[in-house]
Structure formats: structure tokens, C-alpha cells
Amino acid sequence: MSGSNGSPRDLKAGGSLRGRVRVPGDKSISHRALLFGAIAEGTTTIEGLLPAEDPISTAACLRSMGTTISPIQSGEIVTIEGVGLDGLEEPSEILDCGNSGTTMRLMLGLLAGREGRHFVLTGDSSLRRRPMNRVGQPLSLLGANVRGRDHGNLAPLAVQGQRLRGAVVGTPVASAQVKSAILLAALTAEGSTSVIEPAHSRDHSERMLRAFGADLEVGGEMGRHILVRPGATLKGQHVVVPGDISSAAFWLVAGALVPGATITVENVGLNPTRTGILEVLEMMGASIEVLNRRDVAGEPVGDLQVSHGPLKAFQFGEEIMPRLVDEVPILSVAACFCDGESRISGAAELRVKETDRLAVMARQLKAMGADIDEHPDGLTIRGGHSLKGAELDSETDHRVAMSLAVAGLMAEGDSRITRSEAAAVSYPTFWDDLERLRR
């Protein structure tokens, strides 16, 4: 399987997949461990941190504000010397968030309450097109001052640190990024802050903030109401990052689709706010077993074993979307090989990811001959037709690149994928792992 950075990668169709694989550390948890470690007192050590572009962007921003963070390398424990809750310095340079929406959105919350300090955040051309008002607007209820293009919606963004005051904030969407930005800002506010979500989003921030010593309560129906009381000192911790279920999803779907396949994905985070993918695979009739369930540093973890079998069409919508939003691209590939018509709805959020993922997946799968209709909030896919090898393009999106790799395995005839290196944003060793499992 050829393809170096910038050159098209050949995807050979056919063959099977067998073996064990360990996916990189969870991206969401990696970002949060870096951010909370930076504003804690004392040393934080992180085991299993994802050594990919997005967390590296978060670390670079924190270093620019005076935080000492050891190099981020595969297999190495990362050490952070915390500067305390109000110890971040005004940087002398613009903070570059790269391609990482999580970095930019969480930084807005982290920096909003740094009174008297000024910060400018930017990112690559894709990130500069992504909406930031969904964070800036709720933060303004606490007194934050965020300015930028399109009335503060588009980067570059300027944050003028303010004295914040606690508030009751209802978030417009069930987004862990929005919620986490408000929680970070609330740590430096005067008075308590309550965050109320329309639906329960991933809860890594709440779990980890409590482990670091924040005064935080979770209540309401399904944990949709979070209360933060400022004033508690965060203390450095040892954080163990489990494997990212969003990266495991590619192997789970591939194992279910590819004839003769049996794959075990080891050490996967099974936080219940992230396991929507397992429910949809179950709905499809996929053969998946959870082995060796355990708890690691406050997060449920297990090994997932998947094997090939016949799959039936599925439907899901907004009720489950916060728990599998990143898995929609690979599930759209799965739908092409299910018996019947599958429908994904409530997924309008995907139009403002690294790319418009609904449009990109529809475009790329149609190039392979898929029977697929695009809707404002989702996709309808009629399965049971063969896909044909084609010239494909990730359109710079990491999840699209890896989803198309799985489609390419199942196609009749070989494919080529342009910009396959995008996978490195969340899974730097994806193509190597694919080669190994094919042997």
C-alpha cells in the first residue's frame, strides 16, 4: 500500500483482516489532560496521550503561555509542570490551534477569565471557517470578551481577559466542547456557574475535573445539569488515557464487513457517553464482544472483539447523535453493505466539522457507485450494491480518509486516495496498522 505525504495512496481491494490492534489514546481525554494539568498546581503525568497533530496544537498553545510540557512522543509519558489556576502568562505570539476545533473552543473558555491579559487565536484554513459563536455566546453570559470576524464567529479571534461572574447557562447544542469551555471559564469566575444541556454530551471534562479536585456536581436527568463552584485548587494528577473509541470504530466496522475477519481492539475507552457506535453495530446484527472490562483512572475500559457476519440496515437520529457524532462517516460506509435502506438523521452538526462530512461522504461514496441521498441533517443509503474501486479524496478530513480506506477494502477493484495523510490528525499509525492486520 503506497502513499507518502502528499502523494495518492493505492488501496488494494479484497483480502481479510486478522489480529489484535491497539488504537491511539483518546483525543478528547488527551486535550483535557493537557489543559487541566496546565492550570493545576504541581506535576501532572499523562500515560497514553495521543501523539497526534491536534493534542500537539493544544500543548504548543500552553507552552506559549509559560507551561512546561515534555515532548509528546509515542509510548512516552508526558509531564506537565502546572502553573496554577491563574498562572498562564500573556503570550508574545499568536496562539495557533492548527486544525483542532477542540483546542480553539476550549482555549476560549480557558482564557476568558485571565483578567488584564490579551490573547489571539488562529488556525489553519479549515478551522478558520468553523463556527465559534456557539462557544463565544454562552461565555459572554459570564462576561467574556471574544471578538473576531463575522461578529466573533470566525477565527482569528481576540480574547481580552475579564473578571467573570457565575451564571446559569443553557447550551444551544449538546456539545462537549461548548460545555467544557464554560466549565473552564467557570473555574475563574466569581460565584457558581450552572450549565444545562439539551441532551447529555460526552462527560470526560466532568470526570477529570473532579479527579483534579474541582468543586463540581453533576445532576438532572441523565447528567445534563452541571454546577461548578470556583475556589477549589486543582492538584496535579497521574492520568491514564484509554484508546479512542472513535479510532476503534474503523476496525469495528471493518471487522464486521470484511469476509473472514476477526479483530480484537485492545484497551478501548467505554465511557457510556461515547458508546453509541456499539449500539448501532448491535442494531445491525454485528458480532461484537466486550472482553476484560475494567476501570482505569475513572474511565471504563475494555477490549472489543469483532468478527464478520451479515448486517441489516439501521436508522438513528438526534437522540443518539452526541454519543457517536464522529462515527457517522464510517457508519455511512457500513450502510452501503447492509441489507436494506439505512437512514442517518439529526446529524446537521457534521456540516461544520473539519469538512462538511455529510457532503464529503456522499460525494466520495457516490464516486464508488453507492446509492446514497443527502439531506440537510443526514443521509439515506440503500445497501446491498457492490462498490467499485475509484479515485477518492479525503478532502483533508482524517475521519473521511480512514472511512474511505474501509470502503476501499470492500470494493470491487482497487482505489486510490488523495490526501490520505490526513489520518495523522487523530491516528498517526492507521495505515501501518491496516497493513499489519491484512497480513
Curated annotation (Swiss-Prot):
EC number: 2.5.1.19
Pathway(s) per entry: Metabolic intermediate biosynthesis; chorismate biosynthesis; chorismate from D-erythrose 4-phosphate and phosphoenolpyruvate: step 6/7
Primary location class: cytoplasm
Biological process according to GO: amino acid biosynthetic process; aromatic amino acid family biosynthetic process; chorismate biosynthetic process
Catalytic reaction(s) noted: 3-phosphoshikimate + phosphoenolpyruvate = 5-O-(1-carboxyvinyl)-3-phosphoshikimate + phosphate
Disulfide bonds: none
Pfam families reported for this sequence: EPSP_synthase (PF00275)
Location relative to the cell: Cytoplasm
Keyword DNA damage: no
Sorted UniProt keywords: Amino-acid biosynthesis, Aromatic amino acid biosynthesis, Cytoplasm, Transferase
InterPro entries from the UniProt entry: Enolpyruvate_Tfrase_dom, Enolpyruvate_Tfrase_sf, EPSP_synthase, EPSP_synthase_CS, RNA3'P_cycl/enolpyr_Trfase_a/b
Binding positions (3-phosphoshikimate): 27-28, 32, 175, 177, 326, 353
Cellular component, GO annotation: cytoplasm
Matching Gene3D superfamilies: Enolpyruvate transferase domain
Active site residues per record: 326
Residue stretches in coiled coil: none
UniProt-recorded Gene Ontology molecular function terms: 3-phosphoshikimate 1-carboxyvinyltransferase activity
SUPFAM superfamilies: EPT/RTPC-like
Enzyme class: transferase
Binding positions for phosphoenolpyruvate per the UniProt entry: 27, 101, 130, 177, 357, 399
NCBIfam families reported in the protein's UniProt record: aroA
Subunit structure, as described in the record: Monomer.
Family to which this protein belongs: Belongs to the EPSP synthase family.
Protein name from the UniProt record: 3-phosphoshikimate 1-carboxyvinyltransferase
Classification lineage: Bacteria, Bacillati, Cyanobacteriota, Cyanophyceae, Synechococcales
Gene (UniProt): aroA
